[in-house]
Amino acid sequence: MKLTKGGSYILKKVDRKQFYQDEEIVMQIKKILGQKTTDCKQYIKCECIDGLGDEALIYFEMLANQNQHLQKNDVIMIQDYLNDKTQNDKIVVLVTRFQFCKASHVQPKTAQKESIQLLNTEKTIIQKSKITKNPAEEVLKFIEVNEKDNSSNSEDMIIEQQKQEIKNNQKEKQSINGFNLEDSYSNISDITNFGGKSNFNIGSLSDQLSKQTLLISQLQVGKNRFSFKFEGRVVYKSSTFQNQQDSKYFFITAQDANNQEINLSFWQKVDQSYQTLKVGQYYYFIGGEVKQFKNNLELKFKFGDYQIIPKETLSANYVQPLALQPSKQFGNDSIGDSDYSIHNLIEKEESIAQKGYNGQKNNKYRQNNNNSKHTLLISEVLKTSKQYLSVLAQVVDIQSSDKNIRLKICDNSCNQELKVVIFPDLCYEWRDKFSINKWYYFNEFVRQIYNDEVQLKNNIHSSIKESDDQRKVITYNQEQGVFKKSISINSNDSFEIKPKISYKNNSNQEQRIYSSIEEIIQQAQASEIGQKKEFYVYGNLVSIQMKNKLYYYRCTCQGKSVLKYHGDSFFCESCQQFINPQVHLMLRAFVQDSTGTIPVMIFDQQSSQLINQIDPSIHVQEAGQYVKNCIENGQEEIIRQLFSKLDFARFIFEIQFENKEFNNEQEIAYKVLKIEKENIKEESKYLLKKLEHLINNNQNN
């Protein structure tokens, strides 16, 4: 079942994978069953009903300081929910994002049979009795009747009034500062006036230009619909695409005066607008709608009329009421005594952009935007604030579609993979050229944060080149705190398996074989995929990593980790209920002896015992909660001082390695199973045995 925006649906039929960002489910509050308020959150339990008469039990979660109050008969639109389950034949849903249903503008011609168009203009209560046989049609009729009673707030009425005012005042506005607007802009009316129904008149261009010009930071979803002006410079233009309904569309990326970027998508008169827009030029975009696309905003030009007005054309024919200022995008570029007209500024910036596209290094514009002059490691990409950079990395995963190519790349600088998204035209050029495990140069890519994750994407300056030095990367599991190593394919690198040095401890019932770190690494690298093996080693604990997360949450039911939702509420998918989780420690550190060092993961029981050994006042069962409280209260220094007492502390470690395969790569993870206090007597016997072994080897040689 395909969802449509504003449609009425039975929640138990909704597949989470089909719940897209732009689609919303309409529900009506039938009864308020209870509510709970904490310091920062408010939880309201309601019995709701949809347009088909199906009931659901919904838990609403909202900020306590927003003063939002749900009441009976309120109509809300569910925009995002975390899960749903059945309880007493009712669907139970945890809703995290919603809005009150506000409807005063409907387009019956475009509304589908089970779809209503709901916009943020005026709150309208839809009574349950109004929703009968066909909920969509009844809602449409009700809203139409309601609009007649509230005609002063109707968007259609406002548009009609605006048209009438334009006609009445058209003669007075024909001439501004000696220029005849209708004559001056008749040459661009054909390429900038799109759509079937006219909301804007080219003769009233001065009215349009007087609309508020917003920056990207000022854009809000549902506000100023069709009634604002956005000024931007086109920095990227995609190819045209065709969707399943055989309609064309394309998108661009534009920069505002603060160098922020936003995507603009165009769905009407695609061929004309595609020819109008040129990369590197400034335009006024009038009549767009701000939409939420995943975690980013975009301007969508699909419903209603819109106009694209080249700013270069305006500077030649129109004296703008506001004084034109030099573009802020030039940073410290010296303009001198040159003309401050927009025409000259566009020519200058277009020339600079062209130099950057041709790869010249004297690109001031790009340098002011933190252009990278050398190839960075992935670990540097994750930390840098540079916007443009280059990377040499190995491709470990490829996902290709008609619209883009999505890669995962890695190198030996850290344990994290980096996502790369390649859009047209590089997408078409490299669609069949990437190979798993090969190394490539990704030159002049744009660094962006998407879903709290660092990614790279291409623009018009980006290029890709296959590296001449192909290397093999052995990846050690990131979750268990270990490293990566790259080996040149062209070299003669190999692993030498040395004779095992061991000592059997006959003083205890348990027979132990002690190994060195070097021996453990050798056996791990020579092992087969799927193999596990345990070792005992005398070693020092060094460098517990404070930069990594030190704890996680688990449910008592099956010991599975749980997700932390907004506020302090936790929901276990196994129990299907809200829980009070347990806090467990997970420490990443290094174990070292005289032969080498390996990174290890130390989980809750062993980590808690270490903390208890340093400070006996911290009970083993309370160590996780103690660390969590210190971090949340900004007392990381206490934890840092606590861990510093463990630096180079000597223990007997039981260590397990596991050889895995992930994405056609070899992964070796080391985990600490047991930690014991050092035994000087037993270690002395082990060292004596090791010394005898070395002496015998030297005599034989």
Curated annotation (Swiss-Prot):
The source's superkingdom equals: Eukaryota
| Mutagenesis or variant effect for residue 660 to A | Abolished single-stranded telomeric DNA binding; reduced telomerase activity of the holoenzyme telomerase ribonucleoprotein complex
Provide a GO biological process annotation: telomere maintenance via telomerase
Q: What cellular-component terms does GO give this entry? A: chromosome, telomeric region; telomerase holoenzyme complex
Q: What is its main location?
A: nucleus
Q: Which CDD domains match?
A: RPA1_DBD_C
Which SUPFAM superfamilies is this protein grouped with?
A: Nucleic acid-binding proteins
Q: What is the effect of changing residue 461 to A?
A: Reduced single-stranded telomeric DNA binding
Traits of the deletion mutant: Critically short telomeres.
Extract the Pfam families matched here: Rep_fac-A_C
- Keywords of this entry: Chromosome, DNA-binding, Metal-binding, Telomere, Zinc, Zinc-finger
Q: Which residues bind DNA?
A: 229-301
Compartment list: Chromosome, Telomere
The outcome of changing residue 560 to A is: Reduced single-stranded telomeric DNA binding
* Entry's Gene Ontology molecular function annotations: single-stranded telomeric DNA binding; zinc ion binding
Q: What is the effect of changing residue 423 to A?
A: Reduced single-stranded telomeric DNA binding; does not affect telomerase activity of the holoenzyme telomerase ribonucleoprotein complex
Q: Which InterPro entries match?
A: Euk_RPA1_DBD_C, NA-bd_OB-fold, Rep_factor-A_C
Report the stretches of sequence that form zinc fingers (C4-type). Answer: 555-575
Reported effect, residue 300 to A? Reduced single-stranded telomeric DNA binding; does not affect telomerase activity of the holoenzyme telomerase ribonucleoprotein complex
UniProt-annotated binding residues for Zn(2+): 555, 572, 575
Record function comment: Single-stranded DNA (ssDNA)-binding protein that mediates the recruitment of telomerase to telomeric DNA. Telomerase is an essential ribonucleoprotein (RNP) enzyme that copies new telomeric repeats onto chromosome ends by repetitively synthesizing the short telomere-repeat sequence 5'-TTGGGG-3' using an RNA template component TER.
Quaternary form? Component of the telomerase holoenzyme complex, composed of the catalytic core (the catalytic subunit TERT, the telomerase RNA template component TER and TAP65/p65), which is associated with two heterotrimeric subcomplexes: (i) the replication protein A (RPA)-related subcomplex, composed of TEB1, RPA2/TEB2 and RPA3/TEB3 and (ii) the CST-like subcomplex, composed of TAP75/p75, TAP45/p45 and TAP19/p19. TEB1 and the CST-like subcomplex are tethered to the catalytic core by TAP50/p50.
Q: Which family does it belong to?
A: Belongs to the replication factor A protein 1 family.
What is the protein name for this chain?
Answer: Telomeric repeat-binding subunit 1
Q: What is the lineage of its organism?
A: Eukaryota, Sar, Alveolata, Ciliophora, Intramacronucleata
Gene that this polypeptide is encoded by: TEB1
